[in-house]
């Protein structure tokens, strides 16, 4: 026997038993973003490597350690996309979507990072992202957060997530703060872990989110970014907080929240949970007003967020909030006796014409009545439609309820259609 070929580590199959949860999540995401006026954009999975180096920053974990990068047959360096914002901005610039206009876009699809696979973190993962271009104020930042808050309510997880907020100010303010932070950290250089020592000069703000307890103890007396912010940056942040408070959305200000990508400025936020253990971030985003110009477009204010869909699905499963997911099959059609197979397939097509949303599985492969009912029960269907010789002769169908105590009944095909339609409402 030939050796089995298995999926790449950290890149998982979504099996038929799992897909209904994903479909439900995707349906809710699509409905909500549409209600806020966003349109879908679909970008390629592979991009030129320098797109991500310019957008995310060359001295970041994503670019330095995690990207899947390869050289194609033309000698060009290409990468599987590690996130969606850079690709979305590139598409907007390339097709003239961002020139002097407001644009609201969303996307959903696989991303790739070479990380150590663990619960909630995979090498191929699916990301849902929302990006808005052309609006400056804190009002749109607040609306994006309200959008995510609506999602949590619809998913039933509002009580299990917490909003963390921070502001990174403008680049000139961060530069002054960066100098002050480096000067402070240099006093404790020998006490920092190896990763923080490396980041201290290349990307010192990332030291703030170090998980090392010794580093966190050193940071207690470190300079504060808030002390280096100008009036406009502080006013933007205060405006955002007021809008969230008026909307009844609770938040925590986390001055250590800096995000792992270089393009953010002003508002940054994360929705975190304790339901997933170490992988606590469900959704994250912020403002990136300089990125469009950085990638060759006209200066354009922008803000967005992204969420890892695997983590969201895992959270729903962990909290057992996926019980109402519709099964893959609603109705199973069993056919027994002479003439039933031909009549059965005609009936199945008639039912599909009349009830497009009905999930109907017709029995194939032969077998007696008992075997077919066993297959019907195993399919997860709530109802079995039974078509035997008598039903064929009389133009009727027998309805057997596989879940619950309702009695079996034999009715006309029109009556069966009406009954199934009523149950679908």
From Swiss-Prot:
Chief place of localization = cytoplasm
User: Which Pfam family, any one of them, does this sequence belong to?
Assistant: HGTP_anticodon
Q: Which GO terms describe its cellular component?
A: cytoplasm
Which named protein is this? Histidine--tRNA ligase
Q: Taxonomically, what lineage is the organism?
A: Bacteria, Pseudomonadati, Pseudomonadota, Gammaproteobacteria, Aeromonadales
Q: Which family does it belong to?
A: Belongs to the class-II aminoacyl-tRNA synthetase family.
> Could you tell me one molecular function GO term of this UniProt entry?
ATP binding
Q: Which InterPro entries match?
A: aa-tRNA-synth_II (IPR006195), aa-tRNA-synth_II/BPL/LPL (IPR045864), Anticodon-bd (IPR004154), Anticodon-bd_dom_sf (IPR036621), His-tRNA-ligase (IPR015807), HisRS-like_core (IPR041715), HisRS/HisZ (IPR004516), HisRS_anticodon (IPR033656)
SUPFAM superfamilies the record matches:
Class II aaRS ABD-related, Class II aaRS and biotin synthetases
Q: What gene makes this protein?
A: hisS
**What keywords does the record list, in alphabetical order?**
Aminoacyl-tRNA synthetase, ATP-binding, Cytoplasm, Ligase, Nucleotide-binding, Protein biosynthesis
Q: What is its EC number?
A: 6.1.1.21
Looking up CDD domains in the UniProt record yields: HisRS-like_core, HisRS_anticodon
Q: Name one GO biological process term.
A: histidyl-tRNA aminoacylation
Annotated organism of origin: Aeromonas salmonicida (strain A449)
Name the reaction it catalyses: tRNA(His) + L-histidine + ATP = L-histidyl-tRNA(His) + AMP + diphosphate + H(+)
Self-association and partners: Homodimer.
